[in-house]
Amino acid sequence: MTPHDETFLRRAIALAQASRDEGQAPYGSLLVGPDGRVLAEDHNTVLADGDITAHPEQKLARWAARELDRATVSATTMYTSCQPCPMCAGAIDRSGLGRVVYALSARQFAERYPASVAPPVPQEGPFLFDEAVAVLDGYER
């Protein structure tokens, strides 16, 4: 971790505190471009928006993919108060962001707050492989 990383992680934690102060879940994130400037920042708004996907990491990944050119996205770092959940990690991966730096790991979170970690939803499959793959053949991401 560099001194710049530490500064930006502290900002992510401050955004998490601001989110908590507003009655939202205490998570905050920001994007820092290749030149070291803050490009965007956000905090959790799940309760205010009535949107279970309104995590700051998810919102910022969508913003980056929509608003920035590919070269800038790939050279941009996301700083976040907690390690992104699987939903947000998927969005970050798809957005093309180049790096994520987090303060609290998912393991640390689960150890400290075990009751708040929901059990996984059972998933079944794979089924109907030939039909499913026929739709995907030839599709380029």
PLM regions and their residue ranges:
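Zinc-dependent deaminase
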Residues: 1-22, 84, 90-141
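Small-residue (primarily alanine) positions within well-ordered alpha-helices
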Residues: 12, 16-19, 29, 40, ...
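Short, basic and Ser/Thr-rich N-terminal targeting/leader segments
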Residues: 23-27, 72-74
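Immediate flanking context of iron-sulfur cluster ligation sites
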Residues: 70-82
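A short, polar/charged loop-to-alpha-helix boundary motif
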Residues: 48-58, 63
